[in-house]
Amino acid sequence: MVQLSKTGVRDTLKAGHPPAVKAGGKRVVKKSADENANVEKETRKTDKPRSVLAPSRMQHLSLLLSGPLEKLGHDFPETPVSVRHSRVRPSVEKPHISRIPCIQQPRKF
């Protein structure tokens, strides 16, 4: 179906919208410049300066950070890390079990 656009140029429309363009092996929809301009105007209106913080919020933030900063100043234990992460030796060793011969039938346990 061929229709005239607002500018008077003939565009081919498929299902009421312009056909997709292949880019990089995938089909990508071409958006008109009018739609992109509206989106940019809306984003400019919603931008607010975020760098300025209220003084009360800064004080609240410093109170939150004061606790964890004090905890980071603790002394580390003198035992080496390899000793702390080594496997625990059992107090009683398990007896060595001799190998059970292979039986061709299922066993009940």
Curated annotation (Swiss-Prot):
Disulfide bonds: none
Region of interest (Disordered), residue spans: 1-51, 76-100
Keyword 4Fe-4S carried by entry: no
Compositionally biased spans, kind Basic and acidic residues: 31-50
Keywords noted in UniProt: Translation regulation
Stretch forming the signal peptide: none
GO biological process per UniProt: apoptotic signaling pathway; negative regulation of autophagy; ribosome hibernation
InterPro entries: DAP1/DAPL1
Domain of life of the organism encoding this protein: Eukaryota
One MF annotation (Gene Ontology) recorded for this entry: translation initiation factor binding
Family recorded in the similarity comment: Belongs to the DAP-DAPL1 family.
Main function: Ribosome-binding protein that promotes ribosome hibernation, a process during which ribosomes are stabilized in an inactive state and preserved from proteasomal degradation. Acts via its association with eiF5a (eif5a and eif5a2) at the polypeptide exit tunnel of the ribosome, preventing mRNA translation. Plays a key role in ribosome hibernation in the mature egg by preventing mRNA translation, leading to ribosome inactivation. Ribosomes, which are produced in large quantities during oogenesis, are stored and translationally repressed in the egg and early embryo.
Quaternary data: Associates with ribosomes; preventing translation. Interacts with eiF5a (eif5a and eif5a2); preventing translation.
Protein name from the UniProt record: Death-associated protein-like 1 homolog
Species of origin: Danio rerio (Zebrafish)
Gene: dap1b
